[in-house]
Amino acid sequence: MGKVHVYDHPLIQHKMTIMRKVETGTKQFRELVDEVSSLMAYEITRSLPLTDVEIETPVSVSTQKMIAGKKLGIVPILRAGLGMVDGFLKMMPNVKVGHIGLYRDPETLEPHEYYLKLPTDVTERDFIVVDPMLATGGSAVDAIASLKKHGAKSIKLACLCAAPEGVERVQAEHPDVEIYLAALDEKLNDHGYIVPGLGDAGDRLFGTK
């Protein structure tokens, strides 16, 4: 079963607390999502393989390290996942970005896919699916399944805030996928929102409902 990584870095926790506050406005919320995403990208890529390369510095020839292995891809789940993309791109500016569009049925809380655009070389990439919230887990489960259907073999999931119910569902349906979180909260409420959570991330990111 895929591991769950919850980051306790002081900067991440501090920024998450400000993000959670009901009085935090759209501009600051957007900036915080971007900042926490960059910090998470730094941690998630810690295990990337390295290879030795010979370079010439202004002083001498030297053997140094560069990232090796498969190319990376980021796939935000629309729309809220878009808020995390720039934070990841600051750390990994050359990665390709796919998109998966899902909306949640207000009655069943289950997701429905309406858009999918992936790099043409899916089988040659390690993917990081990004979505600020992991609530019921339905959107993440479907997004991961869509990637696998198109040939993806290595997938990670990065979320700012998660409920145990969502984590358990992803682990049950995709045990090969590692999950990376800035916060693991208490539970879901009767409306499918994470408690204490941070509200509707998409609404708070874009200022619309």
Curated annotation (Swiss-Prot):
Molecular function GO labels: GTP binding; magnesium ion binding; uracil phosphoribosyltransferase activity
Alphabetized Pfam families for the sequence: UPRTase
Gene3D superfamilies (UniProt xref): 3.40.50.2020
Free-text activity regulation comment from the record: Allosterically activated by GTP.
Record keywords: Allosteric enzyme, Glycosyltransferase, GTP-binding, Magnesium, Nucleotide-binding, Transferase
GO BP: UMP salvage; uracil salvage
Family recorded in the similarity comment: Belongs to the UPRTase family.
Record protein name field: Uracil phosphoribosyltransferase
Organism this protein belongs to: Exiguobacterium sp. (strain ATCC BAA-1283 / AT1b)
Lineage of source species: Bacteria, Bacillati, Bacillota, Bacilli, Bacillales
